[in-house]
């Protein structure tokens, strides 16, 4: 508590300063939140055997988690843009904690879906408000701030393979109960964040008139709509590909390389770990070279690697997955900041739209890819999705960073 007063005083006196302690804490909370979500795909190999679920049913579980989060995130962002709710952050994590607790004891497929609904709802509340906190603490370093925030989430997702290998394989479904402790820790951190957030609202009240005027003067022109549509297509390409790897590459590795669940999960861990590193690097690169440059390079440079992956051997696959994760995910946080600058004054809405859309696209992809695997097999599906990053060529059509500044100057 000793740091609370100096921190508050510093942020009030110097609103343009990057508040690293808050960024680090909200990044840790993002990691804890997304580690709860990571329990779901981590549990797939366990549920597939213990409940005899099909790939389509596993896809429906992923769909429920991601679609609830996807639909609700823009709604939460829109609402809190108008009426900020600092304590929505701990409330959201409490909902996720209840979902995780129920998941540990769920006896049926339907019960699992109900528990996953609560986890998705908690995530939907957390993400736009967490992104807003990162924006408020960013100062002039928006790319770096969003990267710190998003790398926490990607690090949490990267825990899924470790969760499977170290907890769920030896303990089974009941092992999920330990993650109620993770949720409780996140709630404690978020209570502190909420207090800082509430204090910042007071100091920002003097600027609210100017920000409101900026938001009102930001016309949603055809050019803005066109840019948002392109962003949506790029999110689609990235989300479907990462959904395929995150949800189903474990089964591909087990089938193709004849490895155990634990060994197969190591491939996912490498992909997600380097994805987290890429997410962190993307923000500073965007601050230096421009957001459109990073978005374009991220997808186009990962395309040839994605095409090589289905033909790689068991050892080479580690390196290819690491490079794909590093390059492809470097645009994740950058896409959020680009959308926020595309429509200034709508921080929560744009964060909810882009991140929520990523969840939603991943949800649809999980169901579609699960059905495709059931119908065509694992290998043909992995070859087919390898061409998704090629859609990154659409980023050439995005307005440059300079053009965005001219639109809103």
Swiss-Prot record:
Primary subcellular site in the record, as a coarse category: membrane
Annotated membrane topology: Multi-pass membrane protein
Residue ranges crossing the lipid bilayer per the database entry: 22-42, 58-78, 99-119, 174-194, 217-237, 266-286, 293-312, 316-338, 353-373, 378-398
GO MF, one example: transmembrane transporter activity
Name of one Pfam family that matches: MFS_1
A Gene Ontology term for the protein's cellular component: plasma membrane
Gene3D superfamilies according to UniProt: MFS general substrate transporter like domains
Cited InterPro entries: MFS, MFS_dom, MFS_trans_sf
Annotated compartments: Cell membrane
Record's keyword terms, sorted: Cell membrane, Membrane, Transmembrane, Transmembrane helix, Transport
Homology family: Belongs to the major facilitator superfamily.
Protein name: Uncharacterized MFS-type transporter YfnC
